[in-house]
Curated annotation (Swiss-Prot):
Residues 310-329, 442-452 have a biased composition (Basic and acidic residues). The gene is FEN1. Phosphorylated. Phosphorylation upon DNA damage induces relocalization to the nuclear plasma. Structure-specific nuclease with 5'-flap endonuclease and 5'-3' exonuclease activities involved in DNA replication and repair. During DNA replication, cleaves the 5'-overhanging flap structure that is generated by displacement synthesis when DNA polymerase encounters the 5'-end of a downstream Okazaki fragment. It enters the flap from the 5'-end and then tracks to cleave the flap base, leaving a nick for ligation. Also involved in the long patch base excision repair (LP-BER) pathway, by cleaving within the apurinic/apyrimidinic (AP) site-terminated flap. Residues 275-285, 293-309 have a biased composition (Acidic residues). This is Flap endonuclease 1. It comes from Coprinopsis cinerea. Pfam families: XPG_I (PF00867), XPG_N (PF00752). Interacts with PCNA. Three molecules of FEN1 bind to one PCNA trimer with each molecule binding to one PCNA monomer. PCNA stimulates the nuclease activity without altering cleavage specificity. It comes from the Eukaryota. Binds 2 magnesium ions per subunit. They probably participate in the reaction catalyzed by the enzyme. May bind an additional third magnesium ion after substrate binding. InterPro entries: 5-3_exonuclease_C_sf, Flap_endonuc, HhH2, PIN-like_dom_sf, XPG-I_dom, XPG/Rad2, XPG_CS, XPG_DNA_repair_N. Residues 123-254 are annotated as: I-domain. DNA binds at residues 47, 71, 159, 232, 234. The keyword Cytoplasm does not apply.
Length: 458
């Protein structure tokens, strides 16, 4: 899922943190790619014309293998050296999210069956993509393929994004590659997005710089993690009523998630107490007397006391109705963020989620060796052609490209030889009288300055 709304916040408040590149400009870079995200992406995107996943004659799914083989070759052809990182055991806190995803897949299956009966082809395709699930077999087959391609793959103890971030921090790779923005929350210094997208999409590679993002948001790393949790992450139920703008405002106003949670819980308790007090007041109010027709007096007129009582009753009912309307209106507004109606779930262990981001379960970068060698061509033919039904000609051509580009001596990048110095800011413009004389020079002033004489003011 990633972090909801984070990209939009960075575009608005830290635009300098995001750059777009053509893939060709990334030659010479080593990148740790979130393989688990890539498998899911390939199972959804690599399809037949009828929208079904690619399969061989035996009915086995091959979309993930097709995606990994050809997209990796494209990456390598552009001078990039990829290393793939696979998910390990998910954190305990994530199990609730995973169970909800399972429920949604089951719902999509039922809706998909119904769409086959009465829906359109587009409906069937949409629901079938929602039922995609990455299996243990998918992971094992992709790992086998990558080893035959001689592309490094790492099995993370837990979250793949966290391990990618660790490899980038440790200098093993230049950047982490993933579509999940929580890779930044795991402290990846550089994040590449869209790296494994198909060439047909013509989607530029998005590079996000964490340091520039923190500077633009005016936050330290701890506050950034707090912001990401408040926006909505994989480990906690999202807080209804909190959007990107309100989340940023709350963190800036209170300084951290601990203070934000305390503030929101206090406001929720105050609203609850106020509502209970109003309910008690309404319960204590006397019920209006029933309308009973009173007999006329001797003059044929109603008693004046009865008229006064009726008027009081009428006013009381009108006041009660108005109060009820105001209460309903207030309750409706209170559901959003404007009237402090944000409700934090009773069970919301944000401290535990924060520890997962700040101290993730990863293999230290200095204990990981990434090595790119010659591919096992005959092994690839045996696996992809004999076992999975791929075209032998295309597999051998792909293997030739891998051999050529993985072993080619990479051309050095200019930014590896030079240190880019920040541009010196121009001196501040003078204000008030005499400002014009310090601005654009008039004719003759250059000569006056060159001779060391001070130009006379007119």
């Amino acid at each position: 899922m990633g972090i909801k709304g984070l990209t939009g916040l960075l575009n608005e408040h830290a635009p300098n943190s995001i750059k777009e590149h053509d893939i060709k400009t990334l030659f010479g870079r080593k990148v740790a790619i979130d393989a688990s995200m890539s498998i899911y992406q390939f199972l959804i995107a690599v399809r037949q014309r009828d929208g079904e996943m690619l399969t061989n004659d035996a009915g086995e799914t091959t979309s993930h293998l097709m995606g990994f083989f050809y997209r990796t070759i494209r990456i390598v052809e552009n001078g990039i050296k990829p290393a793939y990182v696979f998910d390990g055991k998910p954190p305990e806190l994530k199990k609730g999210v995973l169970s909800k995803r399972f429920e949604k897949r089951e719902e999509a299956k039922e809706e998909g069956e119904e769409a086959k009966e009465i829906g359109t082809a587009e409906d069937v395709d949409r629901f079938s993509r929602r039922t995609v699930k990455v299996t243990k077999q998918h992971n094992e087959e992709c790992q086998k393929l990558l080893r035959l391609m001689s592309v490094p793959c790492v099995i993370a103890p837990s979250e793949a994004e966290a391990q990618c971030a660790e490899l980038a921090r440790g200098g093993k790779v230049y950047a982490a590659g993933s579509e999940d923005m929580d890779t930044l929350t795991f402290n990846a210094p550089i994040l590449f997005r869209h790296l494994t997208f198909s060439e047909a999409k013509k989607q530029p590679i998005s590079e996000i710089n964490l340091e520039a993002a923190l500077k633009g948001l005016d936050m330290d790393m701890s506050q950034f993690v707090d912001l990401c949790i408040l926006l909505g992450c994989d480990y906690l139920e999202p807080i209804k009523g909190v959007g990107p703008k309100s989340a940023l405002k709350l963190i800036r106003e209170f300084g951290g998630l601990k203070e934000v949670v305390e503030h929101l819980r206090e406001k929720a308790a105050a609203r609850k107490a106020e509502a209970e007090e109003e309910d008690e007041e309404e319960a204590e109010e006397p019920a209006p007397t029933s309308d009973v027709e009173m007999p006329d007096d001797e003059d044929g007129e109603k008693d004046s006391d009865d008229e006064e009582e009726a008027e009081r009753r009428k006013k009381a009912e009108a006041a009660k109705k108005k109060k009820a309307q105001e209460k309903a209106k207030s309750a409706k507004k209170g559901k959003g963020k404007g009237k402090g109606g944000i409700q934090i779930p009773d069970e919301w262990p944000w401290e535990e989620a924060k520890q997962i981001f700040l101290k993730p379960d990863v293999i230290p970068a200095d204990q990981v060796e990434l090595e790119w060698k010659n591919p096992d061509v005959e092994g690839l033919v045996q696996f992809l052609v004999t076992e999975k039904g791929f075209s032998e000609e295309r597999v051998r051509k792909g293997a030739e490209k891998l051999t050529k580009f993985l072993n080619a001596k990479q051309q050095g990048r200019l930014d590896g030889f030079f240190t880019v110095k920040p541009k010196q800011a121009p001196p501040p413009a003078a204000k008030g009288k005499g400002a014009a004389s310090k601005g654009t020079k008039r004719k003759g002033e250059d000569k006056a300055e060159g001779s060391g004489k001070k130009a006379k003011k007119k």
